[in-house]
Amino acid sequence: MDILLVAGLWLGGSVWDDVAAALRSLGHRPVPVALPGQGDGSTSATLEDQVAAVLAAVDAASGKPMVVGHSAACTLAWLAADARPDKIAKVVFVGGFPAADGKPYAGFFELRDGVMPFPGWDPFEGPDAADLDEEARRAFAAAAIPVPGGVATGIVRLSDERRFAVPVAVVCPEFTPAQAKEWIDAGDIPELARVGDLSFVDLDSGHWPMHTKPAELARLLAAAAGPN
């Protein structure tokens, strides 16, 4: 199966290299999606540009792909399901959840000179970054790509109710499946409360398992995709 890999904030497509290699060895065709503004040098990219890049990958896939979104990019994966509900086999959210209609895509941190730079490690102390040593943290911060303001502040627009019929799996790294279910039951993740086929998978890692547990993440993704 084609497995589209959509990276979260501050990350380029190469963050998936080890996961992609493992997926290929398991018989799948991984496709890291090149997002405008995350590795191409552009600071003027918009949320719509990134959605268009994901949709282009969906349309180019052989058969129905599985779309994997990490962290904030869970919303990109979900926007793809909204735009192509009949063309996507499954959506997988890794370490995050989709934003609701009308919400900003990623208004988490302050913009500086039109971009949202990596804020340093203080906001991620605890389970998020517990499995990243000092060397890994330095490398991550040095490679982090400032997110264009037009992406970070873009407003999420969802319109097709058929998105709720697309199967969804949630990979739970720095939180547990039980916590995710509690948040959904509490109304904190309204989009997932309406998904008809929703499953949860535990992964013992921090927020960036593509860095710290790539083989394990690849196995979970392959299992979510089912027989190739």
Model features per residue range: what roles?
Residues 68-73, 77:
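Gly/Ala-rich beta-loop-alpha elbow adjacent to hydrolase catalytic centers
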Residues 164, 170-172:
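Short beta-strand/loop motif that positions the catalytic acidic residue
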Residues 177-204, 208, 216-224:
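Conserved loop-alpha-helix segment in the C-terminal half of the alpha/beta-hydrolase fold
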